[in-house]
Each structure stands twice: as C-alpha cells, then as structure tokens.
Amino acid sequence: MTHDSTFRLNGMVRLLHEGVHSERPPHDRLADPFPADHAAGSALWNGLPEAAFTIPGTSTACPYLEQFFTAPVSQTGNTPETASVPAPVYLCGSATSSMDVARALAAHGQLPVWGSVLALSQRSGRGQLGRNWVSPEGNVYAALRLPRSHPFTGTAAAPAVGGLIAEALTHMGFDVHMKWPNDLLRREEQEEGPGWCKVGGILLEERPLPPHRETPAENLLVAGIGLNLVSSPPAALMRAQRAVPAGLLSSATKSNVSPLSVAGLWMRLVSRIFFCYVEEIDAKGKNAWRSLAERHLAFLGQTVLLTDGPDEQERHTGILEGLDDFGGLRLRNRKGTNSFLSGSLRLDRPPMQP
C-alpha cells in the first residue's frame, strides 16, 4: 500500500483498542483488542499519517482512542481532494463481523447515522442468504449505518445502496457496476474474452435496538460492505451457481488508480457516498435513486437469466430493461415486461465480442 497523499482527511477516527464485547450475557468477544502500535503497522492503517495515534484515551462502554483529522491548508497551491467523513469511523481488529461490532456500538449509543466500522479481518463474515464471506486481512470489511428514510426503508433499499456505492467508486476512478440486487462487478479480460468479475458485495440488515437512556427503542439499519483489494475467494470456495468469478477491485497492471490504505479508501468512499446521497438522492426527489442505480446497472440491455425459488427452479429469461420504483428488476420477453423483487441474476449467454 502507498501513502494516501493524493487527498486530505476531515473527520473523526476512533480506534477500538480494547476490543468489543456483546452487550448481552455471556458478553462474547466481537472484536479482538487492537492496540495503537498494532493498528499503525497493519494493512488497515498502513500509509496514513503516523501522528494519528498520538491520541487521548476515552472511557466509554466500548472504550476507544480518538483522532480528529483536519485537512491542512495547501502550501503548494495544489488542491487535492478532501475526504470529509460525516460521522465517526471505528477501526477494530479481527472481528466476528463488522456488522456485529456496529450493532454493539449502536446499542450503547455510540454509532450515529452515517457512522461506520472497519474491521481488520472477519471470522464469521456473511453474504447474501447467510453465505460465508471469506475475510482475510487487506480487504475492506465495513459496516455503515444508514438513515431509516426513503429509499432505504423498502424493497428499493438494496439497489439504492448499490447504486450509491457504484457511483462513489466510479468517481474515485474504479469502473464498477452493480449486479442486481447487491453485488459489485467490474469488467475484466479473461481467456475467453471480455467478461465480468465480482469485486465486492453488500448486505443490508435491519434489527431492533434496545432503548438507550432517554432514547426510545428504534430499528438499526446497517449496510455490510466488502471489497476485494488484495485477495479474492478462490474458485473452490465460490458456489457452483455463481454468476461471475471473483476478482480484485483494481489491478496495479491494469489500472491507473493509485492504491490506498484500507482505511484511507474507506474514508474516501464514505465521504463520496454521503455526498452522492445528499446531492443525487435526497435533493432530487422520491425516485432519484432509480436513475442513479440504473446508471451503473450491470447487464443492462442484455439477455439475462433470473432464477428463484427452492434450488433455483424458477427460471425467467429476458432483456434487462432496468428497475421499477420498488427496486424490482424489469425483464422483457415475448410475453411482455415483468418485474421481479427476488432472485439470482446472470447473463443468459456470453456478451457479444466488440
């Protein structure tokens, strides 16, 4: 990883140096202790300013060390991008999952909306339908708390979040598309010609939170986000019915995007997601999310196969026309155009050669 010198940071980072335990008996450990010296030399933090860990201790239900970044004024006349993180970013060591840590923090009133957790690695990471997510060090394993407002409160939530993330990554220089409803793909040259590979995934979970002090009980909505930066699951661990092979977000030999530390990339991504939400969705009205998601929708205009039901026995083939207002996939065939709210999507045949 290289030093994150191409952009500046504004925001608060909190290191969970003593680890995190569940709020309920038997208080299982959710994240291992992550001392400052360990964190500073880890893939999670490598490349960011060393001064970030000359920080005071803070005593809370989930103790952390805190650093507030203020982007310095440029003395050279250059104006690098400033990543302004809208809420605290928590860094933790090896965890059961970043989503577990996020729920524990939220239960203690320590994770506001747009706050996030970034784990060094995961022991029990999970993907769609509860599938195990391979989680060694060096990749992004994050959880982001979302507002419980449109479009995140209904069936459009998954493609809306996917569109936001794809838009943010594209702005950062990564050519990423969303495979409905919650996979992140990029194009890749393969032996048989141009193809797709999966570089990340998104999992949404909404669960009730217990009341905290004066705060009434509420539901917690969290997006689990995984991105393959340095490693991807081997083919033997991928399910047989996978739509595309696994791959990396970028390759040093095939991309002009400068590599970032894991934490640096995540902070920049959160900054872009929040900016995009405010400018592209919140400010433009009810269905603005749909235009954004369709802009990055993989397989658009191509013949696809949608499978659903037990053992994926239900099969629907058609031209992918886009999304409906509820986040459903719109397929057109000789019988007309229909919308589907669930299923696994793949190309029905290889894409045409250019």
Show which residues each predicted segment covers.
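N-terminal lobe of the biotin/lipoate ligase/transferase fold
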Residues: 1-163, 167, 193
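Catalytic beta-strand/loop module used to bind and position nucleotide/cofactor moieties
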Residues: 2-19, 113, 119-121, 129-139, ...
